[in-house]
Amino acid sequence: MARFNAFITERLLLSACDGLLKLGARRKDIAVVRVPGAFEIPSAARTLALTGKYDAIICLGCLLRGGTAHYDVIVNEVTRGIGQSAQETGVPHAFGVLTCDTLEQAIDRAGLKMGNKGFEAALAAVEMATLKQVVSRQSSVSKKKQIPRSARNGKDARKKRR
């Protein structure tokens, strides 16, 4: 979670934790890591994912548009970095980074009017972690049921044709 714009990100964090607990997570299994700002989120997410200790990573932050191009650069890099980390590590990453034009929009998305994006990110993280586990189990079961290559089209099959 990014500390920058903490008034917003702390609300996102509380709702994300609430969502995880409601879905059956144990408090002791929820790790919270704080980073200075949104730009640091992808690096921290990748570092955590590479440990192999986490089923999913929930990335929380808040970016507010200012009067310069800085916002656009940071939004693009954070988004790209989170997606890249998820693809490279194979660990699901939920995107809970608000990208808002105004503080009012951020407040709304942090729970006052439009739901809470932290809670939504927690739901997405659990759904994707569950999907990964299901696919992994199905894959390991189907590998056990496969016919050995030699019996399908290898040496044994060629000998019988001659």
Placement of each model-derived feature along the sequence:
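Glycine-rich oxoanion-binding loops at beta->alpha junctions
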Residues: V33-T51, V97, T102-L103
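Active-site nucleophile and cofactor-binding loops and adjacent substrate-binding regions
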Residues: V32-G37, V73-V75, K113
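Short, acidic/small-residue loops that bind anionic groups at enzyme active sites
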Residues: D72-T99
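Intrinsic disorder/low-complexity segments
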Residues: Q133-R162
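A charged, well-structured terminal subsegment
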Residues: G115-R137
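Phosphate-binding/catalytic loops
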Residues: D101-G115
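Glycine-rich phosphate/diphosphate-binding loop of Rossmann-like nucleotide-binding domains
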Residues: M1-P36
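Glycine-rich phosphate-binding loop
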Residues: I8, E40-I82
